[in-house]
Amino acid sequence: MESMKQFKNNNVDLISNNDPLDKNRALIEDLWESVLREECPDDQANRLIQLKELSYSNKVEEYSPKNFKTEIVDIVNSMDLAESISAARAFSLYFQLVNILEQRVEEDRYIQSFTNQNVKKSHDNLDPFAPALARQNAPVTFKELFFRLRRLNVPPGKLEELLQEMDIRLVFTAHPTEIVRHTIRHKQTRVANLLQKIQVEKFLTIEDIKSLKIQLKEEIRLWWRTDELHQFKPSVIDEVDYALHYFQQVLFDAMPQLRGRISSALTENYPDVQMPTESFCTFGSWVGSDRDGNPSVTPEITWRTACYQRQLMLERYIKATSNLRDQLSVSMQWSQVSSSLLESLETDRVKFPEIYEARATRYRSEPYRLKLSYILEKLRLTHERNNLLSEGGWKLSLERESDNKNLELVEKLHYKSVDEFTYDLELIKNSLNSTDLTCEAVNKLLTQVHIFGFSLASLDIRQESTRHSDAIQELTNYLELPKQYDQMSEKDRIQWLNEELNTKRPLIPSEVNWNKSTEETFSVFKMVKRLQEEFGSRICHSYVISMSHSASDLLEVLLLAKEMGLIDQGSQKSTLLVVPLFETVEDLQRAPDVMEQLFQLDFYKSLLPKVGESFKPLQELMLGYSDSNKDSGFLSSNWEIHRAQIALQNLSSRNNILLRLFHGRGGSVGRGGGPAYQAILAQPSGTLKGRIKITEQGEVLASKYSLPELALYNLETVTTAVIQNSLVNNRLDATPEWNDLMTRLAETSRIQYRKLVHENPNLLTFFQEVTPIEEISKLQISSRPARRKKGAKDLSSLRAIPWVFGWTQSRFLLPSWFGVGTALSVELKSDPEQIELLRVLHQRWPFFRMLISKVEMTLSKVDLEVAKYYVDTLGSKENSKSFEEIFDVISKEYNLTKSLVLEITGKNKLLESDRDLRSSVNLRNKTIIPLGFLQVSLLRRLRDQTRQPPISEFIEDRIESKRAYSRSELLRGALLTINGIAAGMRNTG
């Protein structure tokens, strides 16, 4: 057998002597093999290493699973369950180590790009962005961006206007298919840190390097002995803790650095341009507040989430303030202090006599330290009060004496808002500045306070539209209206809801026993009101309505908000922004008409928040990528979203309303995922104007935010793309001819996709049998069910995320490309000359280039040989003919799509223009094959056993037969392969 060394020498397409990735990959390979030999019996370790080397056995360009499938399958099928589990764990570990390594290399490349002071000078005087357009996967840095803007003669005033209005919001979500345990994430971070230390070996002695490698090996061995699977279904609070980890460990310190990099780049290129506000990039979260289809997210959970977020912020501020007190040892003997600061010290002395008694002597001539002591006490009291509120729940009011056992916490001693904390810090900053002193730690803390406040991230409430309709229906039944709500036409509903919104009398009577669903719906609005009273409106000011179909869907939420005191009718102001989420293709097409109806209502327009110097009303709208893709396929979904943005922007402009588009992008291509830089540049010109909101799915958080430089890279990528799109992207608008072509392509693609997915009666059975979808639902990885309705088995009830997850595991990746080939083929058959137009689109239109790039990347991950093995082995005999027909349709569409994508790009191979990505994908494609076969073997045994009459697991574990293993053990093995393949594909759903 070819040795690993020979493999590395022969596979020159994968290995480069000058590539740091390959150098460190060799270290990972050696450590992986060494750990297996120490942790597994010799024969087992040898077989696992043999399996990986078998997958490596052919050169990349000659790669085909056919060449070695039989040998791998024979080894896999000969394994007992213990060996199978070890194999699944081993390959999962391998891929996770490779992922860590690639993240580290990406981080290092970003550092190099930032530290390189020589910005590449474009030789194209007409278009300094031409190099970036030619390599759209390669984002520019702030320094490079501002240099190019200057070359384009973008006026400083225009740039400053955009920076001052810029509003970027990144919203973290809990991902229903987030695979990796929090415990494992911690181990990955430690491994990454050790790899980073090893990479600076030129500064290390031989003994240092040896010690680091020993530590690395020890960490991996501990990892090997840690259970990869969640033992229990995580609670919502567990998911909250997971998401907040990235804020606490990375983002809290990264955000001031981001501002520093903007400042440096502006100083060099636009020295007179004012910096953007500290809050130009802020964060939101759905974790703990997204209740759509998740009964575990109750009002109490959302309240506890808000308290937990404030707790983390207060703890970070207490630590930072304590460090400041150590640092600011300025003495009044050697420096003056502002009168404002001295006055505040006198006020604090009266409020906090105990602190004065304890600290006055020690800090007699050190006013900053004394002031910071008072600040620390206020933060401590705020922290204590927050704990009481968290324990007491959202219905507790500390202002009511009957509820309060700690009255001293509310006697004006704690910080009642973050503004009071900011004011105290500003006093210190201004006093220092008045004597020509600056303190970077004070400036950094102020930046953090401006960005995160006490709330850390805004909690968006999300709920499905019918929940509000059902509540209104029960209400109208109780009130015995002449015409019940469900009997009203949409026109009548709008009229009645608008009348009620303009009526001052209350509509909802108190002391009524509503049904459980209605009571829960009402309680959410009451809890939001209480949240805003305690935390300020910043903590929770957006209410997202999923599956929005009509104007009444928004008016229903506004009516409930009004009834719970979230709308002040006197001033006609609302503290809750109602955000429609248009998800299906039909709803995306209907969205402009829906919003037109709402904009005609004076009361609705008056409730929109007024923003910016223009004080214009702002409407936020969310566009759903997942369900529209599941509904109509990749091409149709993306085009309808693109068209909807243009129509909505035109509508908003006509009504003198600002628009903020909220993109519900997932981690996978089938759910709107892909490189953020490329996706933002592809947005229609004029739709951003410096404002964008994007979901950051749970499954991608680790790849974007686990390391400081990775977080900065992602944040800089998003920000530069928003600036570039807003200022210079209007040169790349589509022509009417391009739009007509895309409309035809989208419609043909949609027909082909729906013909297979929605009209073929055997497709759902095919999906259930030849993918691990049922086993995926048994993973203890999310508080949210995989299906919208309990017990439902139809396609409409299945969420888009597990839909994509299942196809990814079995290597079809169907939602991300199916239908594209047919659409292109039909167009070219009608006019072969159109290939030239398609090539022009690929070169000049960022939107079309983004589409083709995503399809190309996805096609490179498809493995129909492995997919066919799933079909042949897992498909039932009675369905063999229909399954073969379905596979034949998929196979033909794949080959057609691949050939036409290559014809458009002008390349001979997929990903030919991105060597690094092609190398990574090819390596993973080869190495992941044993895991696929292993998964099929375990699924077959598990399903065969499940079909047999039930038998107690106690007996199953001990009898000698073909059912020698319990179902739980077989399921565990299958779930481990799901973990491994997810790591290998760097993708779940």
UniProtKB/Swiss-Prot annotation:
EC number: 4.1.1.31
Gene Ontology CC: one annotated term: cytosol
InterPro entries membership: PEP_COase (IPR021135), PEP_COase_bac/pln-type (IPR022805), PEP_COase_Lys_AS (IPR018129), PEPCASE_His_AS (IPR033129), Pyrv/PenolPyrv_kinase-like_dom (IPR015813)
Cofactors, names only: Mg(2+)
GO terms, biological process: carbon fixation; oxaloacetate metabolic process; tricarboxylic acid cycle
PROSITE patterns for this protein: PEPCASE_1 (PS00781), PEPCASE_2 (PS00393)
Domain of life (superkingdom): Bacteria
Catalysed reactions, semicolon-separated: oxaloacetate + phosphate = phosphoenolpyruvate + hydrogencarbonate
Keyword hit for Lyase: yes
Keywords: Carbon dioxide fixation, Lyase, Magnesium
One of the record's GO molecular function terms: magnesium ion binding
Top-level class of the enzyme under EC nomenclature: lyase
HAMAP family for the chain: PEPcase_type1
Protein name, entry field: Phosphoenolpyruvate carboxylase
